[in-house]
């Protein structure tokens, strides 16, 4: 009998011990910032109605303890973060957010603590003027996040690896903030149910054999799947319109991702795929592909984006018959190998084609026109560059960094500063190229070009080679 009484007393006391202290927070009383400084793991912060802005709180509001932030019964608290700051920075594991209205101008929730739970929350971009680089929830290297019945407006979720650190060197990275993510569980361990993006379903699939995403989805996240098929989707006005990682094969056709804060269509760590007829307008990075292989972008377009079509750490892939207009960086390729650009166009960009430290690239039948900085920039990137048209650019082609080039049968027309700028390009060959209507110079040669050959090129202005080293053979 004594043992039974002891057990009853223990069970009665245990819930009291397990439940932490409850802090009442309100705009007229204690702030969240103050309560979070006082609380401990297991405590609860109940938020009264009203607006919690920079006049009351210190942003970002850092949550470094396993606490619950929830709306008080019948109340509708609004967390209104200023520009350039996250509303909430979740550092602790096991944080819960319930019934909150989070409005932001850069990031709603910056989450680097695992086991985050959000239920019944509203997350919205407060002002579309701050769309570029904005994100509803940045998930940086976290596991087992649970989202239920949350509504996103003008934003969505972005999934990534952990924040950059010294150990990130040599790994694929994302936007200078996070690693792409070397553990598939950063993407596949979550639970997302009953959520919407711009009033449309947020579609999440993980570790499935075959997935066909619905056309009416507001955001599409498919990770760790064997086959992903997406047709005629419109995921505009999200943070990341699509997140496709660790899939064996993806097919995306006739889909669009306009006005997205981070990426329109994002694929990483995929083993093969085709994006056909996809587009992005006024998106930060239009179509962004990283750390993948055997990817083809065909008949895709990007307009008025910060960056148009993006390859990073991509192998044995191609962009074919794509068009980019009015972007900062039209096509960006870096740190990949075995890639091809075929019949692609960059019109009225800053840099039309920007290739940085790529393995050997084939670029054929492409057009760069009206680019205000450079039509084609080859930074330490060996290339076979043939049959391309460079028209009305400030500099048509700039090549430097010691990589070998073969440039043949290209048209350089109307270059306002220089048609072809070469610096330290050894063992390269230039044949059958035509220069017309050059502004200041047709060709400028600087530095070492040992072993390079110049043969049967038609210049409208004399080649400027006063600063070139020895070993540049001019053959007629």
How should each PLM-predicted stretch be described?
Residues 7-15:
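Bacterial N-terminal signal peptides
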Residues 19-35, 178-229:
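N-terminal capping/linker segments that flank leucine-rich repeat
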Residues 27-36, 41-68, 74-84, 104, ...:
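N-terminal extracellular ligand-recognition/capping segment immediately after the signal peptide
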Residues 27-28, 49, 54-55, 64-110, ...:
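Right-handed parallel beta-helix/beta-spiral solenoid domain characteristic of secreted/periplasmic
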Residues 40, 64-66, 74, 83, ...:
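Parallel beta-helix/beta-solenoid
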Residues 56-58, 74, 81-86, 90, ...:
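Short glycine/acidic-rich loop motifs that flank beta-strands on beta-rich extracellular proteins
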Residues 152-197, 427-476:
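Leucine-rich solenoid repeat scaffolds
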